[in-house]
Amino acid sequence: MKINTTDVRTAIYHSLQQWQSVSLLTFKEEYYDENADIKVSFVKGKHNDGWDFDGKGRILAHAFFPSGSMRGVVHLDYDEDWDFASLKQVLLHELGHTFGLGHSSDNKSIMFPWNSSSVDNVNQDDKNGIEWLYGLKNKWAKLSPPVTKPPVTKPPVTKPILTTVPRFPVPTTQVPIIQPRFGNPTTHSPTTRHPLQKIPIQPRFGHSNPPIRYNPPIRYNPKHPLSPPFKSIPNSLLNVVNSSITNLYVYFPNTWNSSIIKFN
């Protein structure tokens, strides 16, 4: 391990301060585990979380996303030769996972999955990611999406090979189906000038109540006589009623005797 408790606490403090400086998150140290949202510990080999360490080299640490029973947990491999710089860098990465960030495809990002000693600060992509999750540090700033993908349910692992753990949760909420505000239309046909309840139209195809459309009164215009398009209808009509199912037209001349005509 090769690192003392004071350096560990200082590395944790500085790592959290970096994330706090670019986000709306705030942190304070707790002395009791049950009060802490984030817990950092050194463990060896098998440690009962399904993600065993492999001794010195390769896997350095892992952390869990902020959901489930292991949320906020950071495990560091006790067998590694830690110093202040390496611990701070790994903590920056793993703490990002506890906030909900996955691996970044930006090789200058602290969330890039390959461990690089040249990257020891959060960059713009990291800032975009944390603001995407928790809001803008500056309320007047423009929110920019990060270049990474949503996280999967498994905890990301810091190791010297490229992994494909995405960053943000895959949305499951479906677009709501908008129901008609007033239900199905119930408005009846407009009332005509004369009662037409007893029109002798016979239904076809077994329909007992064929829909009937009431047309407004047709006034004769000498310039546009009705006889050319409707050769069976007199020039002077009072009203016409049409059934959309039977295709029957009932026309009313200037008398009360109705006539029924079918147009193909």
Curated annotation (Swiss-Prot):
UniProt entry keywords in alphabetical sequence: Hydrolase, Metal-binding, Metalloprotease, Protease, Zinc
The keyword Transmembrane appears for this protein: no
Pfam family, one: Peptidase_M10
Start and end residues of each stretch annotated as Disordered: 176-207
Name recorded for this polypeptide: Putative metalloproteinase 165R
Cofactor: Zn(2+)
Organism ancestry: Viruses, Varidnaviria, Bamfordvirae, Nucleocytoviricota, Megaviricetes
Active site, UniProt feature: E94
Signal peptide interval: none
Entry's EC annotation: 3.4.24.-
One BP term from GO: proteolysis
Cofactor annotation comment: Binds 1 zinc ion per subunit.
PROSITE patterns the UniProt entry points to: ZINC_PROTEASE
Composition skew (Polar residues), residue ranges: 184-194
CDD domains: ZnMc_MMP
Family from the record: Belongs to the peptidase M10A family.
One GO MF term attached to the UniProt entry: metalloendopeptidase activity
UniProt: Zn(2+) binding residues: H93, H97, H103
